[in-house]
Amino acid sequence: MNKNIFITLLISLLLLSGCTGDTCIDPDDFGFIKFNVSARYDPEEITSRQEGNQVAPWRDSAYKVNGYPLTIMVRPWSYILGDKNTSGQLSAWCPWYGQKNNTTTLAAFCVKLQPCTFWDNTRLDMCTPNPANQNDAMISNAPCIMTNGVGLYFLIAAKNTDPNISPDSQSKPQGITQHLGEELTSGYEFYSTSSTGQFSKAGGINYQYKGEDKSKYAQSPLYFKIIDKFYNDNSGQYRLVIKSGVTDTRADPLQFLTDLIKGVLFGKDGIIKKTYQQIIDTSGYRMSVSAILTLYIMFTGFSFLIGNINLTHVELIVRILKVSIVSILLSTDKAWTFFHDYLFVFFIDGVQQILQIINEASATGPGSQSLLGLLISPQTLSKLFSLLFVDWLGFIYIILYLIALYFIFFLIFKATIIYLTALITIGMIIIMGPIFICFMLFNITRSLFENWLRQLISYALQPIILFTGIAFISMIIRTEIYSTLGFAVCKHDFPNLGPINEIFGSFLEDIDPSLGHSIFYWWFPVPMKGGINNFHKANILVPKDHIVVDDSCKNDPDKCKHCAAYECIDERYIELPFLDLVKDAKRISNFINGKFVQLDGILLIFVSIYLLSKFNDTAISTAQFIAGTSGNLTEIQKVNQQSYESAAKQMNRPLNYVAKTVSAPVTSRVSAGKEQVRMFFAEKFENMMMGRLEKQALGSSANKTVQNEVKRKYGIDSKDVKMNAITDYENGIAGLLKNLPKGNELKAKELSQMKFTQLRDKIAANKYGVKDYAALSKEQKAELDKSLKDANLRELASDANFTRDYQDAYKNAHQEMSGRGVGLFGKNIGVLRSWQEIKHRVDTKRKLKEEKRVGIGEKIYAGYTGIKRGVLTAIVGKDLRDAYEGNLTSAEWHDFEYNDPRLRTYSEKLKDDEKAREHEELQMHINKEALAAQADILSPEYLARLEKAGRHSDVEYYQELAQRKLIHEVHGRLFEEGEPVMMGDRFMREKATDSQMRDMIDNAHRKHAEFIDGDRYIRRQEHYDIMHEKAQENLEQTYKELKDHFKRDDIKIEEMPALIAQKVKDTAEGAEIDQKITEELNNFNADVKNYEYSTEVLNKIEDRKQAITDEVNAQIDKINKYRENAKMQTYVKPIVNEGRKLRKLEDHLRNMK
């Protein structure tokens, strides 16, 4: 059970590690915010002030600054060093030669340009927003490309302002603007890992707020813009990485659940507010509060008059306040607003704000603020799995990490359950507020009010104490993750399968250019090898919170400076930015020596997990002790524990949990919902893979093994397929549409998916305004036929359909091989493939043998019950038998299976199952014969070749196999679910009505047409029709020429080669007579061969069509027999196959005389 969960978790995390979209991941990248800023704008976005002076809007990053140092890095880019001009890698722009489609790519002319250099490197600010500076950049080598952030500005907009509200605000925005392309002068550099695995200097900025700006601009929106005077010819983009300084709005794995429940309870129209207002709106409650206030005022006055109380100024003010507070409950408009804004807000929003502060404080470095989000981020997992092949301890570390992740997930989930339980309880307590607030008036009920308030405080403190402990443990775990996995990694093809890597690489680039080179890859550390020469020191921004200990604070640690992430500069290895050169010397030494696995770090993580589990158990009792409610009857800890255990059981044993706790209808709906979601993604992935296989089938990268499988099982040789036929057909249609008056109303791509007859109908309707081709006049038909023939569309359509059939066959063969256990390596390695095929055949035979054994037993028992049933019918009659059959015989064997679409009895179903097994055995035999012949032995083409070779016995044998298989296929199509042509025998004899049988016969006609239209062999008829017509036309022309030349009417086919040669000698002149004779004879022989071959193939296709028709008619005859037995009116509607038998060439020429 737990093993299955662990395996599922491992597979999920492996897949998740491939979702980063980057070729390389920087050492300090544990989930940075990344996006692109384009140098181009849509024309409608730009405002032109005057010639050559355009103003463009600021790009909203959708993030807000949080007051911490704002660190933004601009990715380096160099075409010379191997970076690609794609949206996933490009980080440069060019102020020249851009086109509309260059939003995320450089113009072709700019790709190989050098980076821009400047006459004055201190003046890189081009077209700055400062109105006093409108000078152009001082470029010395134009044309060139801008890199490292030159021309890119960020804007921290002033609160409640919109920099894009007008052109003036776009050019002179309110807020803080800084240029990201300035040379860094603060003693540090940015470094980034390029797509080739090399560390390169990058552009960027580390902006630290001055004075009051930190609080003034906190939570202000962040904008970006590449500033230029003329945008219409720009191309390219900058790829930005925000390392710190913004509030991460990406959802936490468990935050969605928390926000959902909080919104339902405490939202604007939440349950708590509605229930609270319903209570105070109740007339009975208002009367009770009025009575209580009246009694309280009366008792206070009476007690004062008799001297029972001493009303001091303080006591009087307290009593007046009590009366005022309770009186507010009588005001339905102000009651919720008053108590929510001045009391309940501290227990709802106040707790949420404190938790947010705690979470921000625990986020001591890059990555998600949530510990769980950090641990399962694609960047973290990529670095984790990179350890597998660089150190023999890597596998152990990965297993320990996943075990730790498993426990951390459940501990945080348990903490979330505690928090949500406390939140719900707070809501329940607030709902009871209108009742308990009234209890503060009298001494006898005051204790109830005080307990109510204590409970409210207790449940508000629980999540604060709980998440304070989690934050403390989180900081420890974060530090270890940063120190252990704080190195760069890059994708490398692994295993390197040569052309296969390129195939799947182009497949992924079609989806997203940022996805990499191949799906066969693994992450490896950078540098992959140890050695001091592979590590480089530099002054960099330290990427995590730390305390700077220098000479000024050695004696007084309180005076040491605390630096937030990316606030302070220190000398460190750029490959290991989290490790201090002195404190972490041992770990640095391990990395330099090639030891990437730090087991002491994972040990500390497990210690932290143990502490976290203990803290979870004590947090509630601590909150109860502080609030003074530890002795109350409500034991929230037990409630939380029960909630957690139930949820844990659901995760560990989902099937048992659903079966025990949820009713069957709910279970089926949940299962259906899961299946629907699963099928949605499966369908998307399958469509994607099928599209890839379609492209692969027509490309040079097509798998030879799959092509041989297509030839063997589907009778299509890839050599006979015109790979560009679909494109040629579409181009031919497009050319024809240009000559039509309303041709622009049709789309060539859509028409190219149709058959030739459908295409002809569409063009007839478009050109002549009729319904279809049949509605044309004789002259119009002749005109249209001529234009279609001139465009050669019929032949192009035939070739395109043949190519599509080949693509379908390629996909089916690929899937069938995978279904037989022949995987990716088996499709490329013959020995492995043979072993996999043998294993599949053995397994299939074993399965059929077992099914046959079970079927024989069931058949014997069914026969026995049938005898009992017959005897009972003879003794008591049919009606009495039906009444008592359930008790006297095994009725389930002979009664209808109402879950069966054909309403068969179980015994009838057994017979059909036996036929299905016979079909499987027949298919295995056919596959064996096809494997021996290395061809599709049932295809008309193969049978025609055997016929021509004189192997008549083989033809008869294979035709007999084809006939048996065809009968099974026709039955399968006629009896398939939905609208079966024939129901069970008992139903047809006893229950079927006249209208049902008529519908069955009509349905048989429809399915016959569908079967004929979809049969993969019959679909080739158009291809061979064209071949036959061309050969016939050429031969008739040759025969006519010979007839006219030699004045003979009795020319035989065997004479024609000699007569052709003589005719060429009689009519041709020059030295090339022999060459022309050879050419004419070759053409004649090719025409004869094509005629005879196509004639034989077409006759075989007609035989197949007739066999299908005969079998469907046999089923129709059966239905009519049932009708006759039931004394119903005759409804005979057989199918007539309008086939043809083509004559041999000798007979055809003889008929021409």
UniProtKB/Swiss-Prot annotation:
Keywords: Cell membrane, Lipoprotein, Membrane, Palmitate, Signal, Transmembrane, Transmembrane helix
Coiled-coil region list: none
Cleavable signal peptide: 1-18
Lipidation (S-diacylglycerol cysteine): C19
Mode of membrane association: Multi-pass membrane protein; Lipid-anchor
Homology family: Belongs to the TrbL/VirB6 family.
Full protein name: Uncharacterized lipoprotein RC0146
Taxonomic source organism: Rickettsia conorii (strain ATCC VR-613 / Malish 7)
